[in-house]
A protein has these predicted regions:
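Bacterial N-terminal signal peptides
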Residues: 11-21
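Secreted, disulfide-rich extracellular signaling modules
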Residues: 2-8, 21-410
């Protein structure tokens, strides 16, 4: 084998090893051997501004629906939107406008997250007679921006019931029985695709919580509506009663969180049910990345501030596209910081450290192609929504956050 080719291959393998070995170093590490045609550098940028803030909790796309109270959280009500076509036959709701179709009744059901009933309060169901097809937004609706008064008075009440149809497993459902007048109310001639949303709430205040499956829980029984009907074949012949099932496609719990704690506001905090997010600004103002350089990693590093063992807790991050307010902890009715989803990244906490690799956006910033307003941190929907994570901020003398960039330069 050509000696020069063999030597270059050895150099490449050595560089790979150096990248791994020096990934935890903060100082620049030039590879100065005259025989090596590339240089490996590591540079650290300080986080100079950091702040947590709160927005109304947005609980869409979580696995569960919550009612009642838990640990200071008030679960006011749940909003549920149904699919426009039935699960198996693909029957649209307009099917029931046919004069040969007689709707006998409807049953709206939610699957309880437990297989036993200890306390069985009464729930009530409302709908939206004046709403179109977009009563709520699963990703944006919350206790501040949603107007509950647009819902009807309650149209049905229900309680938990055990279903023993499956001999291998007992399931518990919350069932609401509805008569055909509800379908008639839905079928306003001015609404071609009539409203398919419901509001479910406890009839009375409860001190405990009641948890149900949402439409996002994989392999579970999400909310559904069954429409029982008969069909006339002719004036004198009518088929037996059958039904169509319509599954929920959007749902969320509207919750009011407890007051913010001192820890929530003094550390960098993230948590879905508390509505907590954080922003940080990395000082990269005077940095210009050599056009020939290739960044292998650009880790934004945070240290976990709780004495707890975590597994599979994921934090997501993006650059923000407007200036942040880093003066003090604030609460907003709406998130004021828009994200650039093109640079979305996520990672899990490992050994009490969170290392978010922003290699792509760091390259753009280093090439002076992107304005650096900072980065947002928020919790992933896959986490426990009631778990708030705390990280040390810039006032910590030993565990302050930092961005560490490793790059190779020919």
């Amino acid at each position: 084998m050509n000696f020069f080719l063999l030597k270059n291959r050895i150099i490449v393998f050595c560089l790979i090893g150096l990248i791994t070995f020096f990934s935890c170093e903060e100082a620049a590490i030039p590879v100065k051997d005259d025989g090596i045609p590339m240089k490996l550098d590591t540079i650290s940028f300080p986080v100079i501004k950091a702040m947590s803030y709160q927005v109304p909790p947005e609980m869409g796309r979580t696995d569960l629906l919550y009612f009642g109270n838990k640990d200071g959280y008030n679960f006011s009500y749940n909003l549920i939107k149904l699919d426009s076509s039935s699960v198996t036959a693909g029957t649209p709701f307009s099917f029931y406008n046919d004069s040969l179709i007689i709707v006998d009744s409807l049953k709206f059901s939610l699957r309880f997250d437990s297989d036993s009933i200890e306390n069985n309060p009464e729930f009530q169901l409302r709908y939206f007679p004046d709403g179109g097809d977009s009563v709520f937004n699963e990703l944006e609706s919350n206790y501040i921006n949603f107007d509950k008064s647009i819902a009807s008075t309650f149209i049905s009440t229900g309680q938990l019931e055990s279903d023993t149809t499956d001999t291998n497993q007992t399931k518990v459902f919350l069932n609401f029985l509805l008569d055909s007048s509800i379908v008639n109310a839905f079928k306003d001639t001015n609404i071609t695709d009539f409203n398919r949303s419901f509001l479910v709430e406890l009839k009375n205040e409860e001190s405990e919580s009641f948890i149900f499956h949402s439409s996002d829980k994989v392999g579970a029984d999400g909310p559904q509506l069954k429409v029982y009907y008969r069909q006339f074949v002719s004036d004198s012949v009518v088929l037996d009663t059958t039904f169509r099932t319509y599954a929920a496609i959007e749902d969320l719990s509207i919750i009011i969180p407890p007051p913010i704690s001192t820890d929530d506001s003094s550390y960098l905090s993230v948590g879905t049910a508390m509505g907590l997010k954080s922003i940080v600004l990395v000082d990269m103002v005077d940095w210009i990345l050599d056009p020939r350089a290739i960044i292998s990693s650009a880790e934004l590093i945070f240290n976990f501030a709780l004495d707890d063992t975590l597994q599979n807790y994921t934090v997501i991050s993006y650059p923000i596209i407007n200036e942040g307010d880093f003066l003090q902890f604030s609460s907003f009715d709406k998130d004021p910081y828009d994200e650039d989803f093109n640079y979305y990244t996520s990672t899990s906490i490992v050994e009490d450290k969170l290392k978010i690799n922003h290699r792509k956006i760091a390259t753009e910033i280093g090439h002076q192609k992107y304005n650096n307003y900072g980065f947002k941190l928020e919790t992933s929907l896959s986490n426990d929504p009631f778990r708030t994570m705390l990280f040390y901020s810039i006032d910590s003398p030993d565990y302050f956050p930092v961005m560490r960039v490793i790059y190779v330069l020919p």
